[in-house]
Amino acid sequence: RVDAVVVAGPSGVGKGTIIRKLMELFPQQFGFGCSHTTRGRREGEQEGVHYHFTSLDAMREAVARGEFIEHAEVHGNLYGTSVAAVGDVTKRGQVCLLDIDIQGVKTVKASPLRPKYVFIAPPSMEVLENRLRDRGTESEESLSTRLHNAREEVDYGTTE
C-alpha cells in the first residue's frame, strides 16, 4: 500500500491542478497533505485549504521540534509538510497527495516516508514563463528567480 504520492515540479507547472483533479475524481482514495508556508496569502487562497500560513518564527520552532517531514526555503520563503498533515490523511485510509518542490523531494527521500514520486515538467520554459506571468503574482525579479530554479528542477526531475 502506498501512503503518499509526491507531485513535484517547478512553480506554475500545474501540480495543484493535477492534485485537485485526482481528489475530485477519486475522493475516497486521495486526500491533500496541506503544507505550511511563511509566504503571504495570494488572492483566493484559504487557510488550511491551499496552505497553512504561518510566521517565520513559528515555522522555525516547529521545524526544530521535528514536526516536519520536509521543509525547505524556496524563493525566499519557508515551505514544509508536517507529520500531522500526512497523518491526518492516512488515518482516514486515503493516500496523501503532496505538492512539493524539488528541495522538498530531496528531504522526503531522506525521511522515513516512502512515497511514490511523480514529476511534472512544463511543455517548455516559454510556456512556463507565460503561465507565471499570467498569474500576475510575480515581480520581474521573482519571475527570473523562479525560471532559473525551474531549469534546475527540470534537470533534477528528469535525471533522478
Give a label for each model feature.
Residues 35-96, 103:
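ATP-dependent small-molecule kinase phosphotransfer cores
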Residues 24-32:
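Post-Walker A helix-loop "phosphate-sensing" segment adjacent to the P-loop in P-loop NTPases
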Residues 13:
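ATP-binding Walker
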Residues 105, 137-160:
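Small-molecule kinase domains that catalyze NTP-dependent phosphoryl transfer to phosphate-bearing small molecules
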Residues 8-10:
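P-loop (Walker A) phosphate-binding loop of NTP-binding proteins
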Residues 16:
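Walker A/P-loop
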Residues 96-101, 111-134:
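Conserved phosphate-donor/acceptor-positioning beta-strand/loop module used by diverse small-molecule
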Residues 1-5:
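Pre-Walker A (Motif I) flank of P-loop NTPase domains
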